[in-house]
A protein has these predicted regions:
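Short, isolated positions in well-ordered beta-strands
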Residues: 11-14
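Short, surface-exposed, charged amphipathic helix/loop patches that serve as local interaction elements
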Residues: 17-93
Length: 93
């Protein structure tokens, strides 16, 4: 497990094996290539559940972002936070 904190102060503990999971890349590509917002949203939800282990943990992550940003969890902010977390996993290895 990799523990850390993002620049905005969100604490995380993630399984470092996620970086080797082919589903991660699949879902990132699926999000990027989505032709409709609903497709991108569905892929994002699947990605969050994969990274955090379940829907409840993923939702708690989004709630924490919203609490730091006037009650809104903006997609760009969430992606920035996720990128920092995944970069921390890469840096460990």
């Amino acid at each position: 497990m990799v523990k850390g904190k993002t620049k905005s102060g969100i604490a995380f503990e993630l399984d470092e094996r996620i970086k080797d999971d082919a589903r991660l890349m699949y879902l990132l590509v699926k999000m990027q290539n989505a032709t409709a917002p609903i497709e991108a949203g569905r892929a994002m939800n699947q990605l969050l559940a994969l990274i955090f282990g379940d829907d409840d943990a993923a939702y708690a992550f989004m709630e924490e972002i919203a609490s730091k940003h006037n009650g809104v969890c903006e997609s760009e902010v969430m992606i920035t936070e996720l990128t920092e977390m995944l970069d921390a996993i890469k840096a460990k290895n």
